[in-house]
Amino acid sequence: MEPLHPDQRRFLRRAGIAGRCGQGWHDRERPASGQGSGAAERGRLSRLGAAPARGGVSASLPVFPWDTLADAKALAGAHPDGIVDLSVGTPVDPVAPLIQEALAAASAAPGYPATAGTARLRESVVAALARRYGITRLTEAAVLPVIGTKELIAWLPTLLGLGGADLVVVPELAYPTYDVGARLAGTRVLRADALTQLGPQSPALLYLNSPSNPTGRVLGVDHLRKVVEWARGRGVLVVSDECYLGLGWDAEPVSVLHPSVCDGDHTGLLAVHSLSKSSSLAGYRAGFVVGDLEIVAELLAVRKHAGMMVPAPVQAAMVAALDDDAHERQQRERYAQRRAALLPALGSAGFAVDYSDAGLYLWATRGEPCRDSAAWLAQRGILVAPGDFYGPGGAQHVRVALTATDERVAAAVGRLTC
């Protein structure tokens, strides 16, 4: 293993974080098109009794995007055959019986669970990642269960001690919680997909997301290797959100921890995984982070103090889900069939679908403002997510989820093709 860059551990030393990024960086976040300014929207919602009347932490955050869909949801809900909700990527299929049984069997546990997770859970994570995704050289100490991956992403910059002197880089089109987590920690945020956009500066943390939410874009091995090499040369922590890794359709996603990317060296790398999509466990809040041993140990040390523990019955359910590949394959096939139905139906309605090579979404456009497309679909009883939820680059796209029942997907197809 090559010697570490002198700054490789800077993000672990709270006192050493201040001043680590150069001056002149500016947060490129802007209120998304169609959502209005955060202050104005919060004021409107306050008058409706739907938001805090006073400032505070929430005043530093953008409007919760789903709150802006109320009108479109009401319009879609008025359809005589009912709404087809393709907006939120929430599972609708039954949890596999073996997982339910594992949860129930562990439900008599009265004590506090271990923040680090049971040894059995950590063993299952290591084995499943090797078996399913070819991730090798992980040890149990490199695994940390989390209370759903959204929780981890929202608090990761804070848990790492980042602050106002630090820069967090997120994809130009991105899961909104990357930005929210940076704001909660008080860091600066830059949207960038290319390393050349960063110039000579060294951010504290750089997010990757492949397959992407919302676009379904898959980053290839060469791209990932380039990012890892660049980050290691500057002491930058790379966090790869891999919640959709097992859902490749037209491309085969690869983990940042795969030997072809990192040569088996997990230094400076974290991979975030969820069982919400692959095992329909969104309601269980079951996820985990794996990678760099020292960083995982630091996260564990802080999370112990904060009581960030995955309940023991959920840990038992996670073991059952990770040890069984059959239910995961069955769920993948369900999504594949829904994708095969929706993809041509969107085309017949005048939408072009960009990327969408993997994951749970179709990234669709008719070359018009995304809110207009969302309204057109809502008139037909179909609710989707406007692309501006995910950044300015999504202003002419909508995100169409595959997470509806077969019956509701068939209804959407009928409305799009009539």
From Swiss-Prot:
GO molecular function, a single term: pyridoxal phosphate binding
Positions of the UniProt region annotated as Disordered: 22-42
GO biological process, one term: biosynthetic process
Keyword flag Ubl conjugation: no
Cofactor needs: pyridoxal 5'-phosphate
Keyword set includes Transferase: yes
Entry keywords, A to Z: Aminotransferase, Transferase
GO cellular component term, pick one: plasma membrane
EC number(s) stated in the UniProt entry for this protein: 2.6.1.-
Top-level taxon in the UniProt lineage: Bacteria
Catalytic EC class: transferase
Pfam families: Aminotran_1_2
UniProt similarity note: Belongs to the class-I pyridoxal-phosphate-dependent aminotransferase family.
Protein name, per record: Probable aminotransferase Rv1178
Organism placement in taxonomy: Bacteria, Bacillati, Actinomycetota, Actinomycetes, Mycobacteriales
